[in-house]
Curated annotation (Swiss-Prot):
Species: Histophilus somni (strain 2336)
Annotated gene: kdsA
Pfam families reported for this sequence: DAHP_synth_1
Protein name: 2-dehydro-3-deoxyphosphooctonate aldolase
Pathway given in the UniProt record: Carbohydrate biosynthesis; 3-deoxy-D-manno-octulosonate biosynthesis; 3-deoxy-D-manno-octulosonate from D-ribulose 5-phosphate: step 2/3; Bacterial outer membrane biogenesis; lipopolysaccharide biosynthesis
Protein family according to the UniProt entry: Belongs to the KdsA family.
GO molecular function terms attached to this record: 3-deoxy-8-phosphooctulonate synthase activity
Protein backbone atom coordinates (compact mmCIF):
# COMPACT_ATOMS: atom_id res chain seq x y z
CA UNK A 1 0.00 0.00 0.00
CA UNK A 2 1.18 3.50 -0.82
CA UNK A 3 2.16 5.58 2.22
CA UNK A 4 2.38 9.35 1.95
CA UNK A 5 4.73 11.15 4.33
CA UNK A 6 4.24 14.74 5.50
CA UNK A 7 7.41 16.55 6.56
CA UNK A 8 6.84 19.11 9.30
CA UNK A 9 10.21 20.50 10.30
CA UNK A 10 12.11 17.49 11.60
CA UNK A 11 8.91 15.48 12.16
CA UNK A 12 7.84 12.85 9.62
CA UNK A 13 4.15 11.95 9.69
CA UNK A 14 3.39 8.70 7.86
CA UNK A 15 1.72 5.37 8.47
CA UNK A 16 5.02 3.49 8.20
CA UNK A 17 7.00 6.04 10.27
CA UNK A 18 7.40 6.12 14.07
CA UNK A 19 4.15 7.39 15.53
CA UNK A 20 3.70 11.08 16.32
CA UNK A 21 1.95 12.11 19.53
CA UNK A 22 -0.60 14.88 19.01
CA UNK A 23 -1.18 15.74 22.63
CA UNK A 24 -2.29 18.46 24.96
CA UNK A 25 -5.58 19.88 26.21
CA UNK A 26 -9.11 19.81 24.89
CA UNK A 27 -9.45 23.59 25.19
CA UNK A 28 -7.14 26.34 26.39
CA UNK A 29 -8.22 27.08 29.96
CA UNK A 30 -5.42 29.50 30.80
CA UNK A 31 -1.96 30.47 29.65
CA UNK A 32 -0.36 28.93 32.76
CA UNK A 33 -2.13 25.59 32.38
CA UNK A 34 -1.19 25.40 28.71
CA UNK A 35 2.44 25.97 29.68
CA UNK A 36 2.22 23.27 32.37
CA UNK A 37 0.67 20.68 30.07
CA UNK A 38 2.98 21.41 27.14
CA UNK A 39 6.06 21.28 29.38
CA UNK A 40 5.04 17.83 30.65
CA UNK A 41 4.44 16.50 27.15
CA UNK A 42 7.79 17.85 25.96
CA UNK A 43 9.56 16.30 28.94
CA UNK A 44 7.98 12.87 28.41
CA UNK A 45 8.28 12.72 24.63
CA UNK A 46 11.90 13.88 24.63
CA UNK A 47 12.76 11.27 27.25
CA UNK A 48 11.07 8.50 25.25
CA UNK A 49 12.12 9.70 21.79
CA UNK A 50 8.59 10.26 20.47
CA UNK A 51 7.89 13.06 17.94
CA UNK A 52 5.44 15.53 19.47
CA UNK A 53 2.89 18.16 18.37
CA UNK A 54 0.92 20.24 20.91
CA UNK A 55 -2.86 20.35 20.49
CA UNK A 56 -5.61 22.48 22.00
CA UNK A 57 -8.63 24.49 20.88
CA UNK A 58 -8.97 28.25 21.30
CA UNK A 59 -12.75 27.99 20.88
CA UNK A 60 -15.03 24.99 21.36
CA UNK A 61 -17.74 26.34 19.10
CA UNK A 62 -19.82 23.14 19.21
CA UNK A 63 -20.45 22.85 22.96
CA UNK A 64 -23.80 21.24 23.78
CA UNK A 65 -24.88 23.93 26.24
CA UNK A 66 -24.91 27.70 25.79
CA UNK A 67 -23.57 27.90 29.35
CA UNK A 68 -20.48 25.73 28.73
CA UNK A 69 -16.98 27.20 28.61
CA UNK A 70 -15.74 27.70 25.04
CA UNK A 71 -12.20 29.02 25.41
CA UNK A 72 -10.28 32.30 25.28
CA UNK A 73 -11.06 33.00 21.63
CA UNK A 74 -8.85 33.22 18.56
CA UNK A 75 -6.82 36.33 19.36
CA UNK A 76 -5.80 35.29 22.87
CA UNK A 77 -5.45 31.64 21.84
CA UNK A 78 -2.99 32.45 19.06
CA UNK A 79 -0.88 34.46 21.52
CA UNK A 80 -0.68 31.43 23.80
CA UNK A 81 0.22 29.14 20.89
CA UNK A 82 2.97 31.52 19.78
CA UNK A 83 4.42 31.58 23.30
CA UNK A 84 4.38 27.78 23.48
CA UNK A 85 6.21 27.57 20.16
CA UNK A 86 8.84 30.08 21.27
CA UNK A 87 9.29 28.57 24.75
CA UNK A 88 9.33 24.87 23.94
CA UNK A 89 10.07 24.74 20.21
CA UNK A 90 6.94 22.67 19.56
CA UNK A 91 4.72 22.39 16.51
CA UNK A 92 1.04 23.19 17.17
CA UNK A 93 -2.29 21.93 15.85
CA UNK A 94 -5.65 23.63 16.43
CA UNK A 95 -9.10 23.65 14.87
CA UNK A 96 -11.03 26.33 13.00
CA UNK A 97 -14.80 26.69 12.67
CA UNK A 98 -15.23 29.74 10.45
CA UNK A 99 -13.77 30.70 7.08
CA UNK A 100 -12.37 34.00 8.41
CA UNK A 101 -10.27 32.09 10.98
CA UNK A 102 -8.32 30.03 8.44
CA UNK A 103 -5.58 32.43 7.34
CA UNK A 104 -4.73 34.07 10.69
CA UNK A 105 -4.64 30.67 12.38
CA UNK A 106 -2.48 29.15 9.63
CA UNK A 107 0.02 31.98 10.08
CA UNK A 108 0.71 30.86 13.67
CA UNK A 109 0.08 27.12 13.96
CA UNK A 110 1.54 24.29 11.90
CA UNK A 111 -1.54 22.14 11.31
CA UNK A 112 -5.14 23.36 11.07
CA UNK A 113 -7.87 20.92 11.94
CA UNK A 114 -11.23 20.43 10.25
CA UNK A 115 -13.76 19.55 12.98
CA UNK A 116 -15.78 16.37 12.55
CA UNK A 117 -19.14 18.14 12.62
CA UNK A 118 -17.99 20.50 9.84
CA UNK A 119 -16.06 18.09 7.64
CA UNK A 120 -18.56 18.21 4.75
CA UNK A 121 -18.82 22.02 4.65
CA UNK A 122 -17.18 22.60 1.29
CA UNK A 123 -16.57 26.35 1.64
CA UNK A 124 -14.72 25.82 4.92
CA UNK A 125 -12.75 22.88 3.52
CA UNK A 126 -11.66 24.95 0.51
CA UNK A 127 -10.70 27.95 2.64
CA UNK A 128 -8.55 25.75 4.84
CA UNK A 129 -6.93 24.02 1.87
CA UNK A 130 -6.02 27.30 0.18
CA UNK A 131 -3.91 28.39 3.15
CA UNK A 132 -1.39 25.74 2.06
CA UNK A 133 -1.17 24.46 5.63
CA UNK A 134 -1.22 20.82 6.65
CA UNK A 135 -4.87 19.86 7.20
CA UNK A 136 -6.04 17.34 9.81
CA UNK A 137 -9.48 16.02 8.86
CA UNK A 138 -11.53 14.62 11.72
CA UNK A 139 -13.75 11.84 10.35
CA UNK A 140 -17.34 12.70 11.24
CA UNK A 141 -19.03 10.30 13.64
CA UNK A 142 -21.82 9.87 11.08
CA UNK A 143 -19.56 9.10 8.09
CA UNK A 144 -18.28 5.72 6.98
CA UNK A 145 -14.49 5.38 6.57
CA UNK A 146 -14.86 4.95 2.81
CA UNK A 147 -16.52 8.36 2.45
CA UNK A 148 -13.46 10.20 3.77
CA UNK A 149 -11.95 10.08 0.28
CA UNK A 150 -14.43 12.72 -0.92
CA UNK A 151 -13.11 15.21 1.64
CA UNK A 152 -9.51 14.48 0.64
CA UNK A 153 -10.47 15.13 -2.99
CA UNK A 154 -11.95 18.54 -2.13
CA UNK A 155 -8.67 19.55 -0.49
CA UNK A 156 -6.60 18.18 -3.38
CA UNK A 157 -8.69 20.14 -5.92
CA UNK A 158 -7.44 23.30 -4.18
CA UNK A 159 -3.84 22.25 -4.76
CA UNK A 160 -3.14 20.98 -1.25
CA UNK A 161 -1.99 17.38 -0.77
CA UNK A 162 -0.85 17.74 2.85
CA UNK A 163 -3.68 15.85 4.53
CA UNK A 164 -3.87 13.86 7.75
CA UNK A 165 -6.98 11.79 8.55
CA UNK A 166 -8.18 11.27 12.11
CA UNK A 167 -10.73 8.76 13.41
CA UNK A 168 -12.59 9.77 16.56
CA UNK A 169 -15.22 7.03 16.70
CA UNK A 170 -18.48 6.29 14.93
CA UNK A 171 -22.05 6.64 16.15
CA UNK A 172 -23.39 3.43 17.66
CA UNK A 173 -27.07 4.06 18.25
CA UNK A 174 -27.86 7.11 20.34
CA UNK A 175 -25.27 8.81 22.55
CA UNK A 176 -22.49 6.26 22.13
CA UNK A 177 -19.40 5.79 19.98
CA UNK A 178 -17.44 2.75 18.86
CA UNK A 179 -14.17 2.48 16.94
CA UNK A 180 -14.07 0.22 13.88
CA UNK A 181 -10.48 -0.99 13.74
CA UNK A 182 -10.93 -2.09 10.11
CA UNK A 183 -11.85 1.49 9.26
CA UNK A 184 -8.28 2.70 9.69
CA UNK A 185 -7.13 0.53 6.79
CA UNK A 186 -10.07 1.66 4.64
CA UNK A 187 -9.16 5.30 5.28
CA UNK A 188 -5.58 4.61 4.22
CA UNK A 189 -6.74 2.98 0.99
CA UNK A 190 -9.36 5.50 -0.16
CA UNK A 191 -6.96 8.39 0.48
CA UNK A 192 -4.05 6.78 -1.41
CA UNK A 193 -2.02 6.47 1.76
CA UNK A 194 -2.67 9.67 3.70
CA UNK A 195 -1.32 9.51 7.26
CA UNK A 196 -4.04 8.20 9.58
CA UNK A 197 -4.15 9.01 13.28
CA UNK A 198 -6.43 7.96 16.14
CA UNK A 199 -8.17 10.36 18.53
CA UNK A 200 -8.51 7.96 21.43
CA UNK A 201 -9.87 10.35 24.04
CA UNK A 202 -12.78 11.70 21.97
CA UNK A 203 -13.62 8.13 20.99
CA UNK A 204 -14.34 7.46 24.67
CA UNK A 205 -17.12 10.04 24.89
CA UNK A 206 -20.58 8.89 25.91
CA UNK A 207 -23.50 11.17 26.49
CA UNK A 208 -26.21 11.56 29.05
CA UNK A 209 -29.17 11.77 26.64
CA UNK A 210 -30.71 14.57 28.69
CA UNK A 211 -27.51 16.21 29.96
CA UNK A 212 -25.66 19.35 28.92
CA UNK A 213 -22.16 17.85 28.69
CA UNK A 214 -20.46 14.71 27.40
CA UNK A 215 -19.51 11.91 29.73
CA UNK A 216 -16.54 9.66 29.12
CA UNK A 217 -14.73 6.42 29.91
CA UNK A 218 -11.16 7.39 30.67
CA UNK A 219 -10.73 4.15 32.62
CA UNK A 220 -10.61 2.47 29.18
CA UNK A 221 -8.21 4.86 27.45
CA UNK A 222 -5.19 2.55 27.67
CA UNK A 223 -7.01 -0.49 26.29
CA UNK A 224 -8.51 1.42 23.37
CA UNK A 225 -5.24 3.15 22.54
CA UNK A 226 -3.37 -0.16 22.56
CA UNK A 227 -5.88 -1.57 20.08
CA UNK A 228 -5.46 1.36 17.72
CA UNK A 229 -1.68 1.37 17.89
CA UNK A 230 -1.62 -2.31 16.96
CA UNK A 231 -2.99 -1.38 13.52
CA UNK A 232 0.10 0.63 12.60
CA UNK A 233 -0.82 4.31 12.54
CA UNK A 234 0.89 7.61 11.81
CA UNK A 235 -0.02 9.04 15.18
CA UNK A 236 -2.09 9.12 18.33
CA UNK A 237 -4.27 12.08 19.32
CA UNK A 238 -4.50 12.41 23.10
CA UNK A 239 -5.94 14.87 25.58
CA UNK A 240 -4.68 15.19 29.15
CA UNK A 241 -5.39 17.38 32.14
CA UNK A 242 -3.69 17.94 35.51
CA UNK A 243 -7.06 17.30 37.19
CA UNK A 244 -9.56 15.78 34.75
CA UNK A 245 -12.44 16.05 37.21
CA UNK A 246 -11.99 19.84 37.18
CA UNK A 247 -11.50 20.20 33.41
CA UNK A 248 -13.72 22.74 31.68
CA UNK A 249 -14.37 20.41 28.73
CA UNK A 250 -14.31 16.62 28.25
CA UNK A 251 -12.61 15.85 31.55
CA UNK A 252 -14.28 12.41 31.77
CA UNK A 253 -12.30 11.31 28.68
CA UNK A 254 -8.97 12.97 29.49
CA UNK A 255 -5.88 11.07 30.60
CA UNK A 256 -4.55 12.34 33.95
CA UNK A 257 -1.34 14.22 33.20
CA UNK A 258 0.45 12.27 35.93
CA UNK A 259 -0.07 9.04 33.91
CA UNK A 260 1.37 10.41 30.69
CA UNK A 261 4.85 8.84 30.80
CA UNK A 262 3.83 5.19 31.39
CA UNK A 263 1.01 5.59 28.87
CA UNK A 264 3.25 6.94 26.10
CA UNK A 265 5.92 4.34 26.88
CA UNK A 266 3.39 1.56 26.24
CA UNK A 267 2.21 3.15 23.00
CA UNK A 268 5.78 3.48 21.75
CA UNK A 269 6.53 -0.16 22.57
CA UNK A 270 3.49 -1.32 20.59
CA UNK A 271 4.27 0.97 17.66
CA UNK A 272 7.90 -0.17 17.52
CA UNK A 273 6.84 -3.82 17.56
CA UNK A 274 4.10 -3.55 14.94
CA UNK A 275 6.25 -1.56 12.52
CA UNK A 276 9.08 -4.07 12.82
CA UNK A 277 6.89 -6.67 11.09
CA UNK A 278 6.97 -7.26 7.36
CA UNK A 279 3.66 -6.35 5.73
CA UNK A 280 1.68 -9.40 4.58
CA UNK A 281 -0.50 -9.01 1.48
CA UNK A 282 -3.55 -11.23 2.01
CA UNK A 283 -5.61 -9.77 -0.85
CA UNK A 284 -4.88 -12.69 -3.18
Amino acid sequence: MQNQVIQLGNIEIGNNKPFVLFGGMNVLESRDMAMQVCEKYVEVTQKLGVPYIFKASFDKANRSSIHSYRGPGMEEGLKIFQELKETFGVKVITDVHEIYQCRPVAEVVDIIQLPAFLARQTDLVEAMARTGAVINVKKPQFLSPGQIGNIVEKIAECGNNKVILCDRGTNFGYDNLVVDMLGFNIMKKVSQGCPVIFDVTHSLQCRDPFGAASGGRRDQVTELARSGMAIGLAGLFLESHPNPNQAKCDGPSALPLSKLEPFVAQMKAIDDLVKSFEEIDTSN
